[in-house]
Each structure stands twice: as C-alpha cells, then as structure tokens.
C-alpha cells in the first residue's frame, strides 16, 4: 500500500476520514463494514498514513462527505482557500 509521502494531495486523507467519521457518529467498525474493509485497515488509513486503493478511496469520500478534489486536484483546493 502507498503511504502519504508517496501521494501528493493525500497528506490529510486519514485525518479527514477520521474526523468525518466521528462527526457522523460512526464507529470505526461501522464505517469499515460500510466500505467492506477490515477495521484494522481503516485504522491504518486514519492513523498510519496508508493510502487505500481507488475503490476504497471513492467509497470513503462518498460516505464521509469529503470533497474528492481535495485529494485528486489539491492545487485547486489551495487556490480556493487563498
């Protein structure tokens, strides 16, 4: 699996997923079940900087309500925040 250091734009992905999960009052186990991944794998995404495969990214982004552009087009997000 790729790590954050290898994937520009994904520096905050794990933290974003974790914060969104908590904001939606979802237990890690519940989110992992919705995405059909192991709870430990989700913990690695949230805490260890593991970048999952694209289908998992898409599901996490949809369920958590995260903006896809933040990860795949980070320059646009930076320009909008300035």
Regions of interest found by a model, annotated:
Residues 2-8, 62, 69-82:
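Short, charged recognition helix plus adjacent turn
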Residues 15-34, 59:
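Short basic helix-loop element that most often maps to the first helix and adjoining turn
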Residues 36-51:
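Recognition helix of helix-turn-helix/homeodomain-like DNA-binding domains
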Residues 1-23:
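A short, Lys/Arg-rich alpha-helix, primarily the initiator
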Residues 49-62, 78:
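Short, basic-rich loop-to-helix N-cap that marks the start of a DNA-contacting helix
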Residues 15, 39, 54-58:
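Short alpha-helical elements of helix-turn-helix
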Residues 17, 31-32, 42-45, 71:
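Conserved hydrophobic/aromatic packing and binding residues within compact polymer-binding modules
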